[in-house]
């Protein structure tokens, strides 16, 4: 039996102003299992970013249940959500979100220094250098992000996301700021990580990269739909 990483049931998200209500998510039901590589596709405004924000505990749903490893997280305080996020979730962003004032090494070490359970400097060094080696960037440890190419910065962002050994890796348009060559290289790296056991959930607008996932979700108007056809025999299309 597959091990469930997260479960969503009846998740809704409503953004309200004095003039109107916007229903960004409408009754999302979703399970992600250990070892999955899930892609989330859909047009602008369909709810992809909102869903990813809730998955990553950057926002909370208006209604519904969300469990990570059987822990209900849909109504956590900001402090509790931050703790779970740092312990169980890794992020890779389109814009890299690296800190230019810090070296590559310190960018990757930063999440470890904020963990609830302290780590020794020796342990931090071992984890950081292991992650840098995994993305073939150990030789850049002392450089700063602005000394690197876009493709290299995204590799560093991947290493930072892996440093806490997260249960779930959330990936937001990882190739959006890269040319096709570097985009393909980053996607090959993500696919390799998945084959090694990392669980990924990725938002992408590129159908080629979406087809690299083992499961595809299609969002429209805040609901998960299924496409008519799919050409990748290794990918399961979810129908809701």
Task: Name every feature range the model reports, one short phrase each.
Residues 216-229:
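H-loop (His-switch) and adjacent beta-strand-loop-beta switch element
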Residues 3-219:
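ABC family nucleotide-binding domain
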Residues 1-14, 228-240:
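ABC-family P-loop ATPase nucleotide-binding domain
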């Amino acid at each position: 039996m597959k091990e469930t990483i997260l479960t969503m049931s009846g998740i809704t998200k409503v953004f309200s102003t004095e003039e109107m209500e916007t229903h960004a998510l409408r009754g999302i039901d979703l399970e992600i299992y250990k070892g999955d590589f899930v892609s989330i596709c859909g047009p602008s405004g369909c709810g992809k970013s909102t869903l990813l924000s809730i998955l990553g505990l950057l926002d909370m749903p208006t209604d519904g249940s969300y469990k990570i490893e059987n822990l209900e997280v849909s109504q956590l305080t900001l402090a509790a959500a931050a703790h779970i996020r740092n312990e169980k979730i890794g992020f890779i962003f389109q814009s890299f979100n690296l800190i230019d004032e810090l070296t590559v090494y310190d960018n990757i070490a930063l999440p470890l220094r904020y963990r609830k359970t302290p780590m020794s400097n020796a342990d931090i060094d071992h984890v950081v250098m292991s992650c840098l080696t995994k993305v073939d960037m150990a030789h850049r440890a002392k450089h700063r992000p602005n000394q690197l190419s876009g493709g290299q910065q995204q590799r560093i962002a991947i290493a930072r996301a892996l440093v806490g050994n997260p249960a779930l890796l959330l990936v937001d348009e990882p190739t959006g700021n890269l040319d096709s060559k570097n985009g393909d290289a980053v996607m090959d790296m993500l696919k390799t990580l998945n084959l090694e056991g990392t669980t990924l959930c990725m938002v992408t607008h590129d159908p080629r990269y979406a087809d690299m996932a083992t499961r595809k979700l299609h969002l429209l108007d805040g609901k998960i739909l299924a496409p008519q056809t799919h050409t990748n025999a290794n990918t399961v299309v979810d129908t809701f």
